[in-house]
Amino acid sequence: MIDSIHVSQAGVEGPSPWWLKGGAIFIGVLGLLSLLNAVSLALGGIAMDAMMGEMDPEEICAEDEDTEECEDFIESIAQFSSMPLWDIGAAFSALLFLLSIPTTILLWNAEDRDMALKFAWGWVFVHAFSQFYITHEFLEWYGTFFDSIPIEDFQWLTQFTSFLSYGGVLMCELTLAAGLVLISYKTRPPTKLEAPSAFHVNNE
């Protein structure tokens, strides 16, 4: 039976700072990608509004055999261009970029581990929420878009796309969380306490 814990007299080797620095590099790269995504979403929303402003549903559908279906299709495109996804998605991406700056600095300096990890977890939370929001908003429109297409054989595609989209986002966010858990574990404060091996217990 183990009845004691020894305190090592040898020097305690601290965790490698490159675990935190590696996290800093990763979040820094994702932060730059978030900035590009914010710009693309903002420009995409402006381009969609400009395109829809030049479209006349009555003129486009005038020669179509089924005018009502054509107008429904144009209306679904108009709904896509007016979705808050463009503005809110761009705002989320910009927030991720701004949040990545202090997170990257704290992780790279590796001076305040607890604060750096709190910022990192906050960044992961915002990233997960934004990705699920964007995916949800897009799939909501996607379902409406397919409802406007009278092709019953392809109606299953909306459920299949939803499964893949939500599943992909979930796997991505779980991977980010798992990586941060690993960094937290590898950078935990060292200790001099040593538990004696069970294989060397003296039963006398």
Question: Model-found features: residue ranges?
Answer:
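Topology signature of small-to-medium multi-pass alpha-helical membrane proteins
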Residues: 2-204
